[in-house]
Design a protein with these regions (language model features):
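Bacterial lipoprotein signal-peptidase II cleavage site
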Residues: 17-28
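Extracytoplasmic small-molecule ligand-binding "clamshell" domains
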Residues: 29, 64-133
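Flexible hinge/capping segments at coil-to-helix
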Residues: 147, 159-179
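Alpha-to-beta junction loops
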Residues: 105-107, 123-132, 176-179, 206, ...
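Ligand-binding clefts/hinges and TM-proximal coupling segments of bilobed small-molecule sensing domains
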Residues: 60-62, 67, 187-204, 237-245, ...
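Short helix-initiation/N-cap motifs at beta->coil->alpha
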Residues: 94, 109-122, 166, 184, ...
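Periplasmic-binding protein-like
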Residues: 75-76, 152-161, 226, 230-271
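A ligand-binding cleft/hinge motif common to bilobed small-molecule-binding domains
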Residues: 116-117, 132-142, 191-194, 215-216, ...
Length: 288
């Protein structure tokens, strides 16, 4: 009986082994690529991503924003036309430029730079216009266009109190060789260099430096626009402004020659701001 049971168990094991080895093998890689097709009517559930696993997001194509700015070049050391209050440039030119930009539907951006770099910046197109108490001259008209005048200016002479220079005529007197300080690139620089010769004219980056040279004895007088001259004399004891002016002039905005559309638009804006009293109000705010 025991022998019969042993033979029976052996036969069952052989049958089981044969059944296992005859089952078709499924390739694991193939299984991984199989996509289950849902049975019709069966609810399809979206797979929730595992925490930490990146979920693919469709990238949005950025829309390029329209540039709605207009860029002004100035030299912000020309009070009260342009100067700093904290880190902001303010003054007559800054406010008038803001009003013009508003008329054009633009946001104003002001770039501060050396005065003698303004024309180049306008010519090369790195800025849209230059506004810095700038006078129209034949020399400047060769490289840029100018708008209508929006303000008038006077070139004044600053001297030390008790100076031998008491009138403008003293600078032209026979044998006179007074040293004149000017801001580089300004009409004061242009006129003085023409009148007295480059050897007698010392050029400085701004009016403050020119006045420091006057106080230090490096120059005998400083020629600069009247309004900045008033501010400089007020800030420095022992200085005075001659009663007679050196030159009278008008201020305008410089624009690249090829930008005639902007020139026409700014002239129209200036005319409107003069007509409605805006420019007079701005000037009166700074010049009492």
């Amino acid at each position: 009986m025991k022998k019969f049971l042993a033979i029976l168990m052996a036969a069952m094991m052989i049958f089981t082994f044969a059944a296992c080895t005859n089952e078709p093998a499924v390739d694991e890689e193939v299984n991984n690529d199989v996509v289950e097709t849902p049975v019709e009517g069966e609810e399809v559930k979206e797979e929730t991503p595992v925490e930490g696993e990146e979920t693919p997001v469709e990238e949005e194509v950025p829309v390029e924003a329209e540039d709605n700015t207009i860029v002004m070049a100035t030299n912000a050391y020309f009070q009260p036309y342009e100067y700093y209050e904290a880190d902001k440039i303010v003054g007559i030119d800054a406010e008038i430029a803001e009003a013009i930009a508003a008329k054009l539907g633009k946001e104003l951006v002001i770039n501060d730079m050396q005065f003698d770099s303004i024309l180049t910046a306008v010519q090369t197109g790195s800025v849209d216009f230059g506004m810095a108490g700038m006078t129209v001259t034949e020399e400047r008209l060769e490289s840029v266009n100018f708008t209508s005048s929006y303000a008038t200016g006077v070139q004044s002479i600053i001297v030390k109190e008790g100076s031998a220079i008491t009138t403008v005529d003293d600078l032209y007197a026979e044998g006179a060789a007074y040293k004149v300080g000017v801001q580089l690139g300004t009409t004061g620089d242009i006129y003085a260099s023409d009148d007295f010769g480059a050897e007698l004219v010392s050029q400085f980056a701004n009016g403050n430096e020119a006045v420091m040279a006057l106080n230090g004895g490096a120059v005998d007088c400083v020629i600069i626009d009247n309004q900045p001259a008033l501010a400089l004399v007020e800030a420095n004891e022992g200085l005075a402004i001659l009663e007679t002016s050196y030159a009278d002039e008008e201020y305008a905005i410089c624009i690249a020659k090829e930008n005639e559309e902007l020139l026409a638009a700014m002239n129209a804006a200036i005319d409107e701001l003069i007509a409605d009293g805006t420019i007079d109000a701005v000037v009166a705010k700074y010049i009492k």
